[in-house]
Amino acid sequence: MDSIRPIVVPLEPLTFPLRTAAKEYPQKTAIITPEAGGKEYSYEWLDEKSSAFAASLEDLGVKPRDHIALWLKNSMEYILSFYGILKAGGVVVPVSTHYGRREVLHQLRETEAKGLITSDSLYAPMGNLFSEIKRLRFIVCEGGEETSLGTPAFSSLLEGPKRLDRSIGIDPKETIAVLPFSSGTTGLPKGVMLTHFNLLSCLYQVVQVHEISANDIMINQLPFFHIYGMTVLMGTSVLAGATQVLASRFRPVDEFLSLFETYRPSLFFTVPLIVQEFCHHPKVPTMDWTRLRYVNAGGAILSPEVQERFTQITGVPVMVGYGLTESSPTTHVTPIGRIKKGSIGLPLSLTEDKIVDPETGTTLGPREVGELWVQGPQVMKGYYNDPEATAQTVVNGWLRTGDLAWKDEEGYVFIVDRLKEVIKCKGYQVAPAEIENILVSHPNIQDAAVVGEPHPEYGEVPIAYVVLKDRTTASSEAIIDYAAQGLAKYKRLTRVVFTETIPRSPSGKVLRRLLKSPPRKRSE
């Protein structure tokens, strides 16, 4: 089938697509920034300025393999910084703009970041990070010619005469390009080591299956700090030589929809929540959707009802993609013209999958429910400084997804539920252990467990089961407020259930399945 025919991925760094686009389409518009006055930037300009930025990073002391944190919203500055860090020989550490102080400090420490590229608006409330993060050598702030924080202005790093690209000549299969955070299957968030070859492979796989070309215009709203936005939106646009229209939010929905009227995109990669919002918005049925070839929804489960409803309203088919941070991220996509409702589709080119009995390790047959395992060039090198977690997650080259699934006779995969403990809220990962650690620090809480509760719009939301200490009291509202300090909004508890005990195994592991409803059965 065309969508999974073998492709050849060049042994090149992740900067290769930008260098190639700058040569093939030098004056073509690479980026349009409606939130910054509609400014446009060409591929030649982006390639040139990212090399200048790399040279400035070298002047700031960046050496090959240094970890540089990137904490910006979707913007020209984000894309330029991303490629500039790679050209300086560094490793990009994407940081969520939803994070609070506690989470930012944790990620900078865990990834051993030596530099931070951010904005005045994000950094100002943080206080002095240099005193908190001893390895941190520099902070660059975007926000004008002069910053109010005593840090180098972003614009000043673009003007020097020198150019640098250390990425040329590296070993792409061994050199780490990006170190995003993932909750993995259990526990606290940890760094995922994605090589240049991992990510470049995924770009080629996605461009092929979605038939993305230089003629395409994409509205890229999903955050680039998330692996989905970084690879499937930002990265594929550059590889294909397409034009990306940048947005950092989708609310108010009226304003976001106006981008579709102004720029007439041909492709739109998004999450189920936004597809659902569009289905309920009164403006959507009145709009002209004829230029939009299709919508791709990933990051969470898309209900067949929403998938069908959007197509009925707009005439635009909705494809479904599936993946994990640990697989760069995409492994499965529904092929164009061969969509099966409720399915995540077929494995991408060069990718294999199998359904495995999680208890016995036996490979299962069609319509038997087990854990989905995947194998391909996009599978991570491992978790940063965590060989034990790596060994548990990658077995003989096969990535254990932690998702329960089944395959039909044509190989289409259907997700049933999750083995792993991570909660998926609004397409983001929420690690129960992270919130639990905060809860048990409360002076009146003896024990706590966090699980996901189904939500009609967000997929899941975190709720907590709490055991109070003897002769103490605490209200649900007070506990929710306490746990919210320093956390992103999507990680915040929606309710608290008071209980006498938390079910645990003999080893002390929380038995979350006893706190949740049983998994759904697969459809025959």
Please give the residue ranges for each predicted region:
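Conserved pre-ATP/AMP-binding loop-to-beta segment of ANL
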Residues: 9, 26-29, 159-181, 188, ...
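Conserved AMP-binding A3 loop
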Residues: 40-45, 177-201
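Gly/Ser/Thr-rich phosphate-binding loop
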Residues: 242, 265-270, 279-340, 352
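Conserved AMP-binding/adenylate-forming core of the ANL superfamily
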Residues: 27-75, 79-83, 100-105, 155-156
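Conserved ATP/PPi-binding loop(s) of AMP-dependent carboxylate-activating enzymes
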Residues: 346-350, 362-393, 430
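Conserved AMP-binding/adenylation subdomain of ANL enzymes
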Residues: 200-217, 227-266, 281
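Structural core segment of the AMP-binding/adenylate-forming
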Residues: 19, 59-60, 87-158, 261, ...
